Amino acid sequence: MRKSGRGLALVLASVMTMASLAGCGVNVSSKDDTAAATAQTTTAAGETVATKEGEKVTLKVVDWSDSTKERREAFHKKFMEENPDVTIEYTVLTSDQFKETVISAIKAGNAPDLFPIPSGMKLSSVVDENWFMPMNEYVGEDFLNSFGAGALNEGITTLDGKVYVLPEAANIINTLIFYNKTVLNEAGIDENSLPKTWSEFREVCKQVTEAGGGKFYGMIDSGAQANRLELELRSLASTAGGKCSDISQIIMVDGENTLNSEAMVKAFDFFDTLVKDGSMHPDSVTLKAPEARALFAQNQAAFLVQGAWCISTWRKDNPDLDFGVMAMPVPDDGAKGKLPYVGAQPWMGISANCAHPDVAAKYLKALYSEDYQAGLVEDGGFVSVIDSVNQTAMTDDVMLEYYKLNQEAAALAPDPIVAKPETALVYGEVSAISPSMGEIVQGVLAQSVDYKAELATLAENTQKEWMRAIDAVKASGVDVSAEDFEFKNWDAMKNYTADMYESR
């Protein structure tokens, strides 16, 4: 079954009301909005806007960064003290609320001054619809040069050399394994002998579960979130040589997707044994990531697969939790690939209709200052796109180990959009296939599906949909082909570096 995602923004624009926008905390109108909604940010080619000294400015900022909300609010207070003519109206939405409300606000001509690209949308598409303005002339080259290698990429944050959006953080893997030292000790597992292979991991999980007697289990998972489960299985398959890449990527090997590869089936076999062994916390099938994280902190499981964001949450909410982080186990015959991740992803940009882009740029420069970024890194669970900050501010012992493991156990995967920005149009054309891989994993957790048959069907339907989308974009006059999504020089044990795109 194919779920159509095309035309979502237009549908939302027609069905969402302005009352619903206000109800979610987004003020889509104010006394200054009539002028601002139609303001032109450039009066002529190459000419920028300069806000008059003493002019009162309200910046509307909307995003979904709830994990940094406390830091952000303190930042806003300081920013307004240092810039008394500026008032910041900041709204934090869930990612679902963001999709449902901000897209509608944009279509209605009431976009916030600063906002991120909605999840699943590509830069080329939103720039074509005039959502963002290029910021180079407002922020300056010195500011842009402060970003680390791989943070600003053509087709991702930048088009034709013009930067439209900035990444929130450096992109690191989010499928390392946290281990609960208290649970392992109670089960008689030596922390210095953590499992490194699939068989070892399975045996340790069985030992922990037996020792727990219903009090704790080998592993707990976020079964209510299909995306988390898919990331987990993709990572397992990657260690077996699957070349799965990130969940958002269209990657082909020998002209085919890898969703039913031998490595993927092996990964599902391994996961299935953990469930059949009874090593999974019985509530896993219904838990969202925050709930699984909380039960792990209550010493109900030895292992949890999640990302670095857990660290600061546990430090704040569960200061007595004794935990560490380890690499994902690999097949018994050794790793044939590392955990794939892609470069920093697009986030915040300045609205094309922003009446005071120079003030918005000043906000961004302060947001990415070493002072503010250092605080986020010090909290743990955050890796800044400003390299110099990470070198001095990363002090949490578990976060340091996480960062080290990211360097050792992960490898940068190729990105078709970096290789050829026109491929973004294919992503916009593709519709989701159901059941997805994550939904199939949910079935494994519930022991309710024949995952081998489902994977075969998923791979077949995905291949048909990818080829249909490529043909549709090609028919519109854009030079794209299946070869644009294949990287024959990709060694999954190594980083795919910028120079490799030229020789693929």
Predicted feature descriptions by range:
Residues 319, 326, 378-445, 479-504:
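Long, aromatic- and glycine/proline-rich binding clefts that accommodate carbohydrate-like moieties
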Residues 78-154, 185-188, 193-196, 295, ...:
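Extracytoplasmic "Venus flytrap"/periplasmic binding protein-like
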Residues 77, 81-82, 108, 187, ...:
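Extracytoplasmic/periplasmic substrate-recognition and gating elements
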Residues 157-170, 175, 199-256, 272, ...:
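Extracytoplasmic/periplasmic solute-binding protein
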Residues 202-207, 249-284, 328:
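Glycine-centered hinge/linker elements that transmit conformational signals in sensory
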Residues 44-51, 120-176, 231-232, 239, ...:
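Hinge/lid segment of periplasmic solute-binding proteins
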Residues 1-59, 81, 468-504:
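Short, low-complexity disordered leader/linker segments with a strong preference
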Residues 55-66, 86-91, 113-114, 164, ...:
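Short, well-ordered beta-strand elements
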